[in-house]
Regions:
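Mid-domain alpha/beta scaffold segments of enzyme catalytic cores
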Residues: 1-230
Length: 230
């Protein structure tokens, strides 16, 4: 509810999503999802998410997320994460709301699950992508999905500046910050904030060999397309 209130306070700047982050999936995940589902139902709206699709968009939220799988710290709730992820993927299919997907040390498991629903998925974002060309190509085999690229791309050790132009067209990227984490250079090590996305833009525009204006225009269009922000 606080997220919705914030989005109403800053219309056109803050947009709400709803979902259970994998790091929050514990033994009580079913209860947590039941509460989120209740909120989702409370915010049904009329109209179509896609004029060419008879499936109605039923929520004030713009996406189901941030959801996914995270096995970096622990696999204690591995099965619970898989089940919670699958349930929320079904929400996305039902509502036609795109997915915002978090995946850490679990791409094989994530892809295996998504393949089961590939023809039904409305699209979304693979958030905070830091993988290689092969991994990027695998994720982009899902139609209407884009890669979210953040501050890691500005790090000296990052291979993204080479791998992305080689494997990912500009119309399959959106810019992110993942605030308050992973601040881009020259703010690395400090608290990240959304305003720092300009540094990601500068880095990727240079990597793709285009102007910052052109890259910004394209990635803004990508955001509007994925989240149906017309």
């Amino acid at each position: 509810h606080a997220v919705l209130a914030l989005s109403r306070e800053y219309p056109g700047y803050a947009y709400p999503m709803i979902g259970l982050h994998p790091e929050e999936v514990k033994a009580d995940w079913k209860d947590q999802l039941a509460e989120l589902r209740k909120i989702l139902e409370e915010h049904r709206i009329t109209g179509n998410a896609n004029p060419a699709d008879d499936s109605p968009r039923i929520s004030d939220f713009i996406a189901i997320g941030e959801i996914g799988l995270d096995y970096y710290w622990s696999r204690e709730f591995e099965q619970e994460q898989l089940e919670a992820f699958e349930e929320q993927v079904k929400w996305s299919i039902e509502t036609r709301l795109p997915l915002m997907i978090h995946c850490r040390k679990a791409q094989n498991e994530m892809v295996h699950l998504l393949r089961q629903y590939q023809k039904e998925l409305p699209g979304g974002v693979f958030h905070c992508f830091t993988g290689n060309q092969k991994e990027a190509e695998e994720l982009l085999s899902f139609d209407n999905f884009v890669l979210g690229i953040g501050g890691v791309s500005t790090f000296k050790s990052s291979h993204l500046r080479e791998d992305l132009p080689a494997a990912v067209p500009m119309n399959r990227i959106i810019l992110e910050t993942d605030s308050p984490y992973m601040a881009p250079v020259p703010y690395r090590g400090k608290r990240n904030e959304s305003a720092f996305v300009i540094e990601v833009l500068k880095t990727l525009a240079k990597a793709y060999g285009v102007s910052e204006e052109e890259f910004a225009e394209q990635t803004n269009k990508n955001v509007e397309s994925v989240f149906q922000l017309n």
